[in-house]
Amino acid sequence: MHVLLLNGPNLNLLGQREPGIYGHSSLADIEAALTREAEQESVQLDCFQSNFEGALVDRIHQAMGRCDGILINAGAYTHTSIAIRDALAGVAIPYVEVHLSNTHARENFRHHSFLAERAVGVICGFGPASYSFALNGLLSHLRRNA
């Protein structure tokens, strides 16, 4: 099985950016832990981060026919990007939306997600463990529907 992990804008600053909200783990720490977890499940995990919407859209397109599922933390694009939503719909790959913080307990503009409507599920608010929960949920979905 092959899963793509996508991280959007400013997530490259994890561990430095607002640690009271996002914690002290770096993106590299999160990716390494999730890669180890995926390997234990015999899953290949590809990780990609970009601050650019078009680069994320391109990477989603490249996943078509190559990946069985996608984990996506689109960062602020979650609340603004119809392009990412349409790319995910276009490739028809099951995906789970993931966030470190509980977006529903934050500013009002973070309460709406353009991605959630088509997602297998949404995991938020558990810090770095959100990624592990999202991977487990996605794998469970993929195995049930294989």
From Swiss-Prot:
Name listed for the protein in its UniProt record: 3-dehydroquinate dehydratase
Disulfide bonds: none
UniProt keyword annotation of Amino-acid biosynthesis present: yes
Subunit composition and interactions: Homododecamer.
Active site: residue positions: Y22, H99
Matches recorded under Pfam families: DHquinase_II
One Gene Ontology biological process: amino acid biosynthetic process
Pathway: Metabolic intermediate biosynthesis; chorismate biosynthesis; chorismate from D-erythrose 4-phosphate and phosphoenolpyruvate: step 3/7
HAMAP family: AroQ
CDD domains found in the cross-reference section: DHQase_II
Gene Ontology molecular function, alphabetical: 3-dehydroquinate dehydratase activity
